[in-house]
Amino acid sequence: MTLLGRIISFYSTCILSLCVATVLWFGWRPSFVQPVILAVILYLVPPLTFRLHRAFFPIKKSLSNLSERKYSPWWGAHQIQLIYTAVPQLEATLRIVPGLYSAWLRLWGSRIGRAVYWTPNVEITDRHALDIGARVVCGHKCKFLGHAIKPRGRQTALYTRTITIGSDVFIGAGSRIGPGAVIADGAFLPVLTDVHINQVVGSTSCSEPPVTF
């Protein structure tokens, strides 16, 4: 791991430390300022940090080797988002207010259409790698996996690609959508559907993935 990779691995620790400091400040001298600062630290600082990071270190939407002795932009992006994986309730809270979670994902760089319904336990690994149309329903415990990692001998292969979902799509509970997956307008995915890497799902049919990872 490079020096930059080691440094950025402490990003979530820094965010947590800022949150603790803000809470202690509130206990010492309470006012409306601290809750506002806490919300900014938790929900605005990470996506804005990600955008700045991406400006200098663009994430390649393709196959790469994590074992190489050079900085991985994906690794940095992963560390910036790590706090939401460790504490999923932070994201779930945003889904209480209609439209707020979609707006937050747009802040990360995803394209999200109107009237997308997110159930509280949806899991997204790469918040910048979604292209979703309008009126999409995401069922309970759906997973959107914008990357895949697989060992290949002495190498660690990383594949990243945007997930594309059309409009008027229903995604059944427990479904898992892999990187590069394309789901057509009007598609219906039954409960526990797995859409594999680069797989294309039509409104009535499902094709095998064109690329094997």
Predicted regions and their residues:
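A short, structure-level motif marking secondary-structure boundaries and short turns
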Residues: 85-87, 117-118, 150-151
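Short linear elements at protein peripheries
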Residues: 97-129, 133-134
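Glycine-rich hexapeptide-repeat left-handed beta-helix
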Residues: 138-213
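Terminal amphipathic alpha-helical/low-complexity segments used for targeting or macromolecular assembly
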Residues: 1-108
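Hydrophobic, membrane-inserted alpha-helices
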Residues: 17-21, 116-118, 171
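Glycine-centered flexibility motif
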Residues: 60-66, 109, 113, 139, ...
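Generic structural signal for bulky hydrophobic/aromatic residues embedded
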Residues: 52, 119-121, 172
